[in-house]
Amino acid sequence: MSRAKLEAIRAAKPAVLPSLLLCDFGDLKGELERLTAAGAEALHLDVMDGNFVPNLTYGMPIVEGLRRHSGLPLDVHLMIQDPLSYAGPMVDAGADLLTFHAEAVDDVAEVAGKIRDLGVGVGVALNPDTPLSAIEPALPSVDLVLVMSVDAGFGGQSFNPVALEKLAQLRSRFPKVLLEIDGGIGDQTIGPARQAGADLFVVGSAIFRKPDYGEAFTSLGRALEAADRGATDQGGEVTTGQIASGADPGSTSEDQRQ
């Protein structure tokens, strides 16, 4: 079933994936209903262990609860030091796609292969300062590459335009791999990320800090449509300098709870 959900994600691209890190956990079922009504086609979950990154978030019970109440694909981002120790339990809980960090493991190809053997989609993530060469051994075995546009697990960061360069290189070399971007994605940054080659866009505050999730999805969708037309939403090009200055943070990882 998980591989079928992966194909659903492929069919939905370009797609906005709300990051549940900023949702109201006191009303998780209500948040799920609102996101589904707004047009979410998959959900992104940032799992942090307090070790690989300083913050601590949620684990298998949240994934299991979401699975009971939703058929949406669950995209689980493992920001943890030992991803293989949690991979099986996460799959049992209902994860459809598991992404681990290249910086957390010694052998990216081995870890990717073991996760794939669990019958789910597999992704590999890299932080802004990590070179693409660090993930190359895993690329034949992964379905997705997650390009971080902020450092995983640290707050108060602006969108790092080096992510756009990595996306462009990956798209040129690996046209069939799903490319996902996470960190500082909002109305101003989603277009350049799309033009650089991203398929999936993890969005936090640009959704959850808006009173109407449907309007947030509509605005982000318009920016994606403009990017696909080779234009920008407001008739002018958004430069990497503007992005680097922190315009429209709309972040997920940069707003992680301390």
Task: Explain the meaning of each model-derived region.
Residues 43-60, 150-156:
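Glycine-rich, proline-tolerant flexible connector loops at the mouths of alpha/beta enzymes
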Residues 38, 69, 93, 118, ...:
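Structural motif
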Residues 85-89, 95-173, 178:
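Conserved anion-binding
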Residues 1-22, 29:
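N-terminal amphipathic alpha-helix/helix-capping segment at the start of soluble metabolic enzymes
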Residues 16-20, 43-45, 74-78, 98-100, ...:
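Hydrophobic faces of well-ordered beta-strands that scaffold small-molecule active sites
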Residues 56-76, 114-123, 163-179, 220-227:
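Alpha-helix-loop-beta-strand connector modules within alpha/beta enzyme cores
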Residues 194, 209-230:
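C-terminal helical cap(s) of enzyme catalytic domains, especially alpha/beta-barrels
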Residues 28, 46, 90, 145, ...:
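Conserved, mostly hydrophobic/aromatic
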